[in-house]
Amino acid sequence: MFYSPLDQFEIKPLLMVNNILTLALTNYTLYLIIVVSIIFGYTSIISNGRLGSTRWGVAIIAIYDTILNLVYSQIGKAGGHFFPLIFTIFNLIFAANLISMIPYSFAISAQLVAIVSFSLALWIGNVILGLYLHGWGFFALFVPSGTPLPLVPILVLIEALSYSSRAISLGLRLGANILSGHLLMLILGSLIVNLMSSSILGFIGGIVPIVAVIAITILEVGIAIIQAYVFSILLSGYIKDSVSLH
C-alpha cells in the first residue's frame, strides 16, 4: 500500500454522533482543544501571579516581556489595547507549532484553509478598526505622501492590492513553512528507514543521515518558534497601519 507524505495532514473523524445534526470530533478539533486548554492554563497562571522563581516562571515572564515590548515598539502608546489579542495569538501559534513537533501528533498550523481563514478574519478586523477610528480617512493609507497627482490612480491600485494580499499572505506564510518542514522530515525519515532496513551495509550507512535528520528537527523547532513571533510582528504592523495610517 502506498502512503503519501500528505496523509499526515488529513483531517480524520475520531468520533461521530448522528442525531438530528451530525457532529464529528476530528483530529484537528482534538488538537485545537488541547492547544486552547494549554492557553487557558497558561494565562490563568500569569493572571493569578503564581509564576514564582522557577525556570518555567522565568521563561513565561521572558515571553510575556518579549511580546509586550514587541507590541509597544510596533504600535506605540495604543499597543496596550491590543496586547492581550497579540499575546494570545502568539501563544496559540507557539503551542500549536511545538505540539506538532511531537511524533504522531497533528499539525493544525499546516491546515492552509483554516490558517488562511484565520488570517482573513484578522485582516477584516484590521479594516473595521481603521474605518472605526478614521472613517473614510482610512483610505488615505493607500495614497503615499508626496505622490504626483497623475500617478495617484496607479499607486492607489497597487497599494490596495498589496494591502489586500495581507489577508492571505499572513496565514499562508505560516502554513507553508510548517507544511514544508513536516514534509521534509517525513520524507527524509522514510528514506532513512528504508535504507537501514535494506541490508547491514544500508543500516551502517543510515547512521550518518540520522544525525542530519536530528539537526533538521532541531532547526524545525526553532522555525516553529520563529514563525509564531513573525506572525505577531506582522499582525502588530498591520494594526499600526490601521491605528496611525502609516
UniProtKB/Swiss-Prot annotation:
Pfam families associated with the record: ATP-synt_A
- Give the stretches traversing the membrane: 20-40, 56-76, 82-102, 112-132, 138-158, 176-196, 203-223
Q: Alphabetically, which GO biological process terms does the record hold?
A: proton motive force-driven ATP synthesis
Q: Where in the cell is it found?
A: Mitochondrion inner membrane
Looking up Gene3D superfamilies in the UniProt record yields:
ATP synthase, F0 complex, subunit A (1.20.120.220)
**Keywords on record:** ATP synthesis, CF(0), Hydrogen ion transport, Ion transport, Membrane, Mitochondrion, Mitochondrion inner membrane, Transmembrane, Transmembrane helix, Transport
Propeptide positions in this record?
A: 1-3
Q: How does it assemble?
A: F-type ATPases have 2 components, CF(1) - the catalytic core - and CF(0) - the membrane proton channel. CF(1) has five subunits: alpha(3), beta(3), gamma(1), delta(1), epsilon(1). CF(0) has three main subunits: a, b and c.
State the protein's purpose.
Mitochondrial membrane ATP synthase (F(1)F(0) ATP synthase or Complex V) produces ATP from ADP in the presence of a proton gradient across the membrane which is generated by electron transport complexes of the respiratory chain. F-type ATPases consist of two structural domains, F(1) - containing the extramembraneous catalytic core and F(0) - containing the membrane proton channel, linked together by a central stalk and a peripheral stalk. During catalysis, ATP synthesis in the catalytic domain of F(1) is coupled via a rotary mechanism of the central stalk subunits to proton translocation.
Q: Which family does it belong to?
A: Belongs to the ATPase A chain family.
| Protein name (database record) | ATP synthase subunit a
Taxonomic lineage is: Eukaryota, Fungi, Dikarya, Ascomycota, Saccharomycotina
Question: Which gene holds the coding sequence for this protein?
Answer: ATP6
